[in-house]
């Protein structure tokens, strides 16, 4: 299984992809919050798998910025998990280095799903 963590924002999203055993298969990358960005994200993910049932997307419910991406992924048949920002904040606090970057947040979102 592949877990795609997405840190959503107004203009761009940070995306990270890991396996269910924690291996990073796609280093964090940025996409624009538009159709071109969406297609770029899927293109990078498809390099690792084309099977939708092997992919779990996860993102925070940050303001309303998550809604378009969440809706499009669900419409396209992907499994998407929406997280409360309090959950990711608690997970971030578990790491020794308290670094907050969008790339790190996308990884933490993916890890949160991996750990259940």
Task: Name each region found by the language model.
Residues 1-116:
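Phosphate- and other anionic-substrate recognition elements at nucleic-acid/protein interfaces
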């Amino acid at each position: 299984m592949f877990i795609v963590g997405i840190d959503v924002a107004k203009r761009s999203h940070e995306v990270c992809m890991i396996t269910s055993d924690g291996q990073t298969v796609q280093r964090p990358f940025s996409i624009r919050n538009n159709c071109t960005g969406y297609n770029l994200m899927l293109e990078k993910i498809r390099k690792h798998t084309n099977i939708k049932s092997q992919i779990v997307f996860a993102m925070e419910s940050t303001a309303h910025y998550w809604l378009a991406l969440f809706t499009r992924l669900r419409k396209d048949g992907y499994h998407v998990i929406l997280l409360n920002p309090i959950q990711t904040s608690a997970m971030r606090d578990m790491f020794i280095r308290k670094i907050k970057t969008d790339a790190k947040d996308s990884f933490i979102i993916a890890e949160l799903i991996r750990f259940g």
